[in-house]
Amino acid sequence: MLNGKRIHFIGVAGTGMSALAYICAEKGYEVSGSDIQENISTIRLKSKGVKIYRGHSPEHINDVDVVVVSSAIPPDNEEYVYAKSKNIPILHRSDLLAELTKEKKSIIVGGAHGKTTTTSMIALVLENNKTDPTIIVGGELEDIGGNAKLGSGEYLVAEGDESDGSILKLNPYILVVTNIDNDHLDYYENIENIKSTFLKVIEKVPEDGYVLLNLDCKNIRDIIGKIKDKKYYTYGFSNADFTADNIVLNSSGSEFDVYFRNVKLGRVKLKVPGRHNILNSLSAIGISYILGLDFEQTIKALEKFHGVQRRIQFKGVIENDVLVFDDYGHHPTEILATLETLRLYNRRLVVVFQPHRYTRTYFLSKEIADALSLSDVVILMEIYSAGEKPIPGVSSRNIYDEIKKKYPELEIYLVNDIVEAATKVKSVLRDGDLLLTLGAGNVWKVGEALLAQGKKDVNVEYSQ
């Protein structure tokens, strides 16, 4: 796969990087990595014999054959600079994943939202059908004990990252497109460029491959007529190949009948709530059908699925019967889906939201404000930059002002950091509330701080 046996990952604690490092270690490479932080992923890598360095230094890469980086690594990173000066081959994360997708029949999940959950569901369906897939997922999946697994079977299941166009490097045998939405506009500029990228990815699917599309997404419907000479199936709530009907939604999950072209296949029960998760499961059922897998084993896999870390994840109960949840959602569509789902609990909804990136806040502050209006109380933290440089005039106040203007009755507060957020939460919580920490940054620490002060061992209806 790679020239040389010694591979070093700069920024190894990241979800995508740690998964690739794990796969490389499992394949027998001598792997090392560095990061400014350690987490559960680096602990797991250490158990596999991976050398983990805290912080960055040229000394870490003196004897390596290849250096792997992601888009999050700045060009002035000292290890990156040293690797260039010594002509050590530097590989982008997406190039390494692309190499892996050449080795097996690869099922690539792309789209603005739902990639991690959809990839996880598909992975578990393949696992339950004993195909022993290789799995690379963008979150912690309890069922495989992490975010990656090297299998001996013919399939690989992985997420494709469209944020910087690198999904175009991958080699899908089957491509799943969960949706196309206005995101990463700093890279794409407009929705038409995003649609064009997905059409180009679809073109990469081989003659004997397949495309699986969410027909409920308008932007996908816009491009479907432009797909040429590809075998494709659709899923959605109506007018699609795979559909769901007779739906029962509650806070502990859902039940529904699944149909293929109006022929009932069976009834499905999910332990993860929300209409969006029904859609995610339909894509997994679609993959099962395409690959000719056993339907009963597929349903059993979906019924066992407890979710992915930081996706509507139940964290615990604190005093006065307050439920604490955490979610990764940071785009308006994701925020809306999460809040609609948690509304099923019929509790007052207190949301601590941390905007993610200055560019996303600049482009989508109005839409974020609209999505947050489903809350009863909003506590707005400052923007989590994710390495971006500040944009003059762009801050959380943009969202705050939009909410004040359009939803003056909504209780909303601006805070600066984790400590202020936790303090404000304690002052506004009432008996029986539901507290949600929301965002792709470190907002989850607010919930953890409160739980550390008084977590109760109480059973609730939805436990993941």
UniProtKB/Swiss-Prot annotation:
InterPro entries, sorted: Mur-like_cat_sf (IPR036565), Mur_ligase_C (IPR004101), Mur_ligase_C_dom_sf (IPR036615), Mur_ligase_cen (IPR013221), Mur_ligase_N (IPR000713), MurCDEF_pg_biosynth (IPR050061), UDP-N-AcMur_Ala_ligase_MurC (IPR005758)
Enzyme class: ligase
Pathway the protein takes part in: Cell wall biogenesis; peptidoglycan biosynthesis
Name listed for the protein in its UniProt record: UDP-N-acetylmuramate--L-alanine ligase
Keyword Cell division carried by entry: yes
Any Pfam family: Mur_ligase_C
EC number(s) from the headed UniProt entry: 6.3.2.8
NCBIfam families linked to this entry: murC
Domain of life according to the entry: Bacteria
MF (Gene Ontology): ATP binding; UDP-N-acetylmuramate-L-alanine ligase activity
Localisation per UniProt entry: Cytoplasm
Keywords: ATP-binding, Cell cycle, Cell division, Cell shape, Cell wall biogenesis/degradation, Cytoplasm, Ligase, Nucleotide-binding, Peptidoglycan synthesis
SUPFAM superfamilies on file: MurCD N-terminal domain (SSF51984), MurD-like peptide ligases, catalytic domain (SSF53623), MurD-like peptide ligases, peptide-binding domain (SSF53244)
Family affiliation: Belongs to the MurCDEF family.
